[in-house]
């Protein structure tokens, strides 16, 4: 049986980490693509030479021509400019929209049957634009956001409670920006809701609120520390979890930027919601009920996404 083919568009920090993780998890053969000739080829060779040590069998290649991604089962898009200190995700729109147009055309021509995961920021706008430019079905194009944001929240919670991250579940919905919505009511430690843990004295509401705020600013915290780039280990791990659920038909429930056509009262936008990812891509959207505060936060987040979409339309009239 032929191995799956994974195409990685963008061979920067996230792209290289994705390529390595795909090999370690034996998800399939990997093609690294980048417009800077030599970089994808060099990283592909470097990772391939680690395979005998780590004991995984996967073919690696690097390319600067979109024809190399032909027939890919999964395409993960990281191409674009990362955030620098002082930049918001939204500052990247003008630059990265042009990148999405080129990437969308490449996918449309060479990998129209792929499951596409977008990581490029500002995420909710870029995944929307990528779907438009590629013309792929909306259930086969998804954005990596909530898995990462939820992982950050889980890490902070596990540290606070002194428990294993495996026993912490966390839910972060909405847009992948400062208005994201970490839902404490749906987040648990070994099944016990965070709201109950406050009552039990495990933490205080103030500490919980601080962790929520730190989660919202999680990407910016790393940007400010690195000074020359943005996060790449956790974003790559998050996208690989999504790819694995698709390739192995695991049907995991993962918070992702998914296309909504009526769910949550939203039509025609990509917004972070819990979805089931299986062999057909996004197979179901899980609609959770909000209390009044959560509903207000979610609507604020959705309005931020709408603003990004309008900005995209004003920059590129093909999207209008």
Curated annotation (Swiss-Prot):
GO BP annotations, alphabetical order: lactate metabolic process; tricarboxylic acid cycle
Binding site for NAD(+): 10-15, 34, 96, 119-121
SUPFAM superfamilies according to UniProt: LDH C-terminal domain-like, NAD(P)-binding Rossmann-fold domains
Presence of the UniProt keyword Secreted in the record: no
Record-linked Pfam families: Ldh_1_C, Ldh_1_N
GO molecular function: L-lactate dehydrogenase activity; L-malate dehydrogenase (NAD+) activity
EC number: 1.1.1.37
Enzyme type, top EC level: oxidoreductase
Residues passing through the membrane, by range: none
Catalytic activity: (S)-malate + NAD(+) = oxaloacetate + NADH + H(+)
Keyword Transit peptide attributed: no
Active site (UniProt): 176 (proton acceptor)
Binding site for substrate: 83, 89, 121, 152
Stored InterPro entries: L-lactate/malate_DH, Lactate/malate_DH_C, Lactate/malate_DH_N, Lactate_DH/Glyco_Ohase_4_C, Malate_DH_type3, NAD(P)-bd_dom_sf
Gene3D superfamilies listed in its UniProt record: Lactate dehydrogenase/glycoside hydrolase, family 4, C-terminal (3.90.110.10), NAD(P)-binding Rossmann-like Domain (3.40.50.720)
Keywords of the record: NAD, Oxidoreductase, Tricarboxylic acid cycle
Family, as annotated: Belongs to the LDH/MDH superfamily. MDH type 3 family.
Free-text function comment from the UniProt entry: Catalyzes the reversible oxidation of malate to oxaloacetate.
Name of this chain's protein: Malate dehydrogenase
Gene (name only): mdh
